Amino acid sequence: MDAGQPRPEDRHLPVMRDRVVDLLAPAVQAALEAGRTPVAVDGTLGMGGHTEALLTRFPHLRVIGIDRDAHAQAMAAERLGPLADRVIPFHGTYDRVPEAMAAAGVTKVDAALYDLGVSSYQLDDRERGFAYSYDAPLDMRMDDTAERSAATLVAELDEQELRRIIRRDGEERFAGPIARAIVRARAEAPIETTGRLVEVIRSAVPVAAGATGGHPAKRTFQALRIAVNEELDILDAAVPAILDALHVGGRLVVMSYHSLEDRITKRHLSAWATSTAPPGFPVVLEEHEPVVRVLTRGTEKPTEEEISENRRASSAKVRAVEKIRTSRTTA
């Protein structure tokens, strides 16, 4: 890396790092006490901050590091240095955890972390087109080998589908006017940059809304990013996949940054933590008993001190569970 370039560890502050490690630590320790080499899954390796903390604390731990962003994986390897010898990288999305585990030669894991959403590195890399704060190509692909970019969606989707995505994935109340404005604007010239898209969105959102609801493009950019990367569909498949993959005693931590992510996470964790026995049954059979127990009361959030040091941590919410028996065959 050039001398003028910041190191990966200087550019990325892992959110709630110590709390994440503390939540996963008992599962790693239990594996050691059982006489096996503990294995964790970092389903969203990013720049490796959480994995670095886990590997540093547990010298015998191995981590399967999953990420669809090859650039981030390379920077994680640089950051981890000699610790990288205990990381088994997997290029792909984290719903493919069974494939990643098979490639690593393991059938069960002891701990797992999903740190959701877009990373600081991706937001700060202007050429990736994730941010509305500066002009850049309208891309938003977490995996730059994927075919479909945000510019593709903006160019090809009809008004009804654009409105649906912006409303569903961005929770944007002005989804209709924004979708209409996009269709009108692209008829005049292609919308290929973030700056042009911001202008189009501004033209559709009442000025008064921007005074109280933050940047007028925030929710539309979120919606397009989620749609381009199929983030919610992947999360929906990934939570049950990793719960099934955990050893009994294994733990999962999920860190979300907006209500859509947290809603999906909560739905799955609550279902796995709830008995499936019909109400009023005098005896609850084992197959109906909860598979996990919830470790967090609702969600846990960063401290004010951490938020003051890393403003991007402000919206983080953590949920965690421990697997207490083998998975239901229908889970």
From Swiss-Prot:
GO terms for molecular function: rRNA (cytosine-N4-)-methyltransferase activity. It catalyses: cytidine(1402) in 16S rRNA + S-adenosyl-L-methionine = N(4)-methylcytidine(1402) in 16S rRNA + S-adenosyl-L-homocysteine + H(+). S-adenosyl-L-methionine binds at G48, G49, H50, D67, D115, Q122. GO terms for cellular component: cytoplasm. It is an enzyme of class 2 (transferase). GO terms for biological process: rRNA base methylation. It comes from the Bacteria. Residues 298-312 have a biased composition (Basic and acidic residues). Residues 297-331 are annotated as: Disordered. Its main location: cytoplasm. InterPro entries: RsmH (IPR002903), SAM-dep_MeTrfase_MraW_recog (IPR023397), SAM-dependent_MTases_sf (IPR029063). It holds the Pfam family Methyltransf_5. Specifically methylates the N4 position of cytidine in position 1402 (C1402) of 16S rRNA. NCBIfam families: 16S rRNA (cytosine(1402)-N(4))-methyltransferase RsmH (TIGR00006). HAMAP family: 16SrRNA_methyltr_H. This is Ribosomal RNA small subunit methyltransferase H. It comes from Micrococcus luteus (strain ATCC 4698 / DSM 20030 / JCM 1464 / CCM 169 / CCUG 5858 / IAM 1056 / NBRC 3333 / NCIMB 9278 / NCTC 2665 / VKM Ac-2230) (Micrococcus lysodeikticus). The gene is rsmH.
